[in-house]
């Protein structure tokens, strides 16, 4: 059947689908579905890590190669400091900006280094909202329980408890900074319900939530005149030879020279791993999302958690080709949008958890009920015009202006026709193990945001990533700043790197790649 005919079927079946109520799967059905169809359960995509703190544990092959890869820094590198600071924050997204602002507020001398420009991050691409329990019908306890269930009960309880309890204070802080959250007709903060949540608790800024939060954070960093190094990518950490982190080596991307930063404490906020394109999946992540914190922390001895689980957002764009992998916000489903297969049928409760919805979409496509594009890709429909039908003309334009404009660039009107979607690599559920102050197992090395692990368990609920950034950016920055008041700078060495290389040489195939990779390689090979 032609694509246009399949699209017409979505319109023809809309009234019948509006009368349906799809129950959520039972726990047994969910487990069976995820085990059979979710990419986390493809054994061939995984292998054991050969050495280091996580030796013997399995992760995806792409990440294993990075963890076992060699540093680009030579053993005889000149470690004379070019910069000296109390707190070095690596990463210019939401977590990094929150960390540096709170460290600065506590009186520390701070330096923010970012691989690209300030604000170039996954944070600016977060559309769905930030989960914070602020209404009388909700509570941090309910937020805790929803997140624990969504994470398959594998969340670190203390990290989770801390996040949900500090949510309301984060909302207050963001409002004071000037974030323009959506409000209802009475001027109260408007909350929406997200997938896997039992209560409406999403605070939104249309479908620009992350961009709006990043706008005010970026402005505040600049207003506070915080020292900033842009286009300066961290490539190696420094230690004192006793297991403590004492700084980092950055690479100036303009001239390829190394910058040596002596720091009493280091906070890594380098974000996710999507640009590794795990298992060949497209990604919603920004160009610099190459998991840089993981190999650097690993070489220094930090333990990683839950690095065998990744989130594939259910609704990544499949058509047009220019948007492959781009996020189609969960907010569409939160406001009533249906997922529809090639037969014009709904097949999953659209507000189930992301792993369940993604697995259901993959099942439909693998069992022959997907829609094939003109370039051979498979997907299912997201019935976007349904929102205007249900809530009145102009609903999409008002609540999802970014998405409407994004598709209009390619001649597609999502207010009139549905869009094709398929899961896209979106988030690393695991990362560096941290405590409630964001500190790793390596003294004076902190990790905040997506680079850290333990908080989200084996599946993150929508809206929790932005809260994670704010809470653990704040806690890591504040803790690091207080600690440096009684510290002196430590010795700068690469002794940990020498030990890592010595161990790696015992294992065939190690040290073949350089890590961190910094940027994806999209160069087409000839021949």
Where are these regions (language model features)?
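Conserved N-terminal glycine-rich FAD pyrophosphate-binding loop of Rossmann-like flavoproteins
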Residues: 116-146, 152, 311-314, 322-326
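Short hydrophobic core segments
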Residues: 87-90, 260-271, 446
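Extreme N-terminal leader/targeting segments of oxidoreductases
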Residues: 1-86
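An anion/pyrophosphate-binding glycine-rich loop and adjacent beta-alpha core
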Residues: 1-11, 296, 302-413, 417, ...
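Conserved redox-cofactor binding core of oxidoreductases
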Residues: 38-59, 63, 176-257, 262, ...
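Glycine- and aromatic-enriched mobile tails/lids
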Residues: 1, 70-71, 75-86, 102, ...
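Glycine-rich loop(s) and the adjacent beta-strand/alpha-helix scaffold that form part
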Residues: 265-322, 326, 462-479
